[in-house]
Structure formats: structure tokens, C-alpha cells
Amino acid sequence: SCALMPQSDSLVPWLSVRDNVALPLVLAGGLKRDARAQAQEALEGLALGSFSSHRPDELSGGMRARVAFARTMLTPASAILLDEPFGALDALTRADVCDWLAGILDEESRTTIIVTHDIREAVQLADTVHVMSARPGHITDIIPIDLPHPRGRGTRRLERFHALCARVEDALTNTHARTEHEGTPCQSHE
């Protein structure tokens, strides 16, 4: 099974924040009381504990994104797909949530696929970065990320981190140059 966090938060507007986060556990057959307790703990980890009884429309976009993060991470699934998960967050919150997610990924053994355009996020969170071209689904480079765990805020200060970011950037630049010469998928190559 796979949990998905789409770019939009997709929160249920008539449920409280806590019940939105608990929803996947309840749908999987868990007791509502236990699911709500786990949801509250996840919300506390994202500095949203005091907003657990609020409705989604009472939160900022960044807060709703963090609620969606908590819900996705509590979903009982063997794999997780995060589509631009940090897009709605300001720079400071983005760094905090990235550190929070890095901690969770270090603790869990679930396969996690993160779709992002942010090289720093990819290098901090991934074990492997797959560089894709403008042609959908075409992988042009695979870069192993050999950074120590756990990967918190200090990771972004390591020389190796910056070297890996440069390597990913070079791969993206080379991919972009190749794609421009190849044309778009709809163009004829006669």
C-alpha cells in the first residue's frame, strides 16, 4: 500500500485538525481514541498541538501543509509518495519540517519517494536522487547520497552536502541541455 501527500493539502473541511490527522488510522480499523492520541503526538512534533481542535479553514497554508504531512506520515502504508511537500512552507518552517521528516525517515524503514525541485531538500532527505528530464518518467541520472544519519540541520553545513548538491545541479544542467537539443516529446525528429 502507498500513502500519498499531493501538492494540495486535501484536508477534510468539516473535521478538526486532529481528526484529519487521525483519519487514515481510523479508516484502517484503529480505535478512534488511539488514533486521536497518535495524531495529537504528531501535531505536537510539528508545533501544531494547540491547533488540534481547529478546522482546516482556520489555519494558514503552511499550517495546513504540516497537518497534511502529519496525516500522511501516520498512514499505515509500506510506501509514501510526497509531491512537492514543502511548497507551501516559508523558509524557516521548511527547514524545521525538513529536519522533522529527516528524523522520521531515519527511524522508519518505509520506502519514501519525494518529488521536489529543491536540490537541498533532495540531498538532505534521500538515500538516492533520481534526476529526471523534461520528458515525463525519463530518469537521466541516479546519484547515491552518502551522508551520515541522522540528517538534521547540521547536515546542511557539511562540505559533502554541498558537493552532492553541486553534483545534482550539474546532472540537472546536463539533462536540461540534452532535452533542449532533443526537442519536446510532441516534436518530430525527422
Describe each model-derived feature in a short phrase.
Residues 80-83:
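Catalytic Walker B motif of ABC-type/P-loop ATPase nucleotide-binding domains
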Residues 26, 33-51, 103:
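Conserved ABC ATPase "signature" region
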Residues 74-78:
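A short, proline-enriched helix->beta-strand linker immediately N-terminal to the Walker B motif
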Residues 15-22:
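Short coil-to-helix segment of the ABC ATPase nucleotide-binding domain corresponding to the Q-loop/switch region
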Residues 55-59, 63:
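Conserved ABC ATPase signature
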Residues 5, 69:
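Hydrophobic anchor residue at the start of the ABC signature
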Residues 94-109:
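Helical segment within the ABC ATPase nucleotide-binding domain
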